[in-house]
Amino acid sequence: MSSRLAVFAYDIRDDRVRRHALKTLREWRLDGQLSVHECQVDAIQARRLFEQLGDELDPATDAWLFTWVEGHRAVLARGKGRTTALQDGLLLAA
């Protein structure tokens, strides 16, 4: 099974759970910020990560997002930033 680029993002209220999510995703990520992480994973790894971290969240207060990055899909953006397609599925967001 081949690995693909994926994005994991979260909004977690509890500091302990948030720190654990950050520590876990830093082991997998290629790049990212505090709550948004680009990771190179296969489908099994993605499912395990999503379920592992999702089990710790409080659905009443927290949010957890996973998506595959698909180069052939349109990119939607909203707000002050801008996006520019560079080449071969690369995207510049500023």
From Swiss-Prot:
Protein function: CRISPR (clustered regularly interspaced short palindromic repeat), is an adaptive immune system that provides protection against mobile genetic elements (viruses, transposable elements and conjugative plasmids). CRISPR clusters contain sequences complementary to antecedent mobile elements and target invading nucleic acids. CRISPR clusters are transcribed and processed into CRISPR RNA (crRNA). Functions as a ssRNA-specific endoribonuclease. Involved in the integration of spacer DNA into the CRISPR cassette.
Subunit note: Homodimer, forms a heterotetramer with a Cas1 homodimer.
Source species of the chain: Allochromatium vinosum (strain ATCC 17899 / DSM 180 / NBRC 103801 / NCIMB 10441 / D)
Swiss-Prot/TrEMBL keywords: Antiviral defense, Endonuclease, Hydrolase, Magnesium, Metal-binding, Nuclease, Plasmid
Class in the EC hierarchy, top level: hydrolase
SUPFAM superfamilies assigned: TTP0101/SSO1404-like (SSF143430)
Protein name: CRISPR-associated endoribonuclease Cas2
Gene: cas2
Family per similarity comment: Belongs to the CRISPR-associated endoribonuclease Cas2 protein family.
Domain of life assignment: Bacteria
Residues reported to bind Mg(2+): 11
EC identifiers of the protein: 3.1.-.-
InterPro entries: CRISPR_associated_Cas2, Virulence_VapD/CRISPR_Cas2
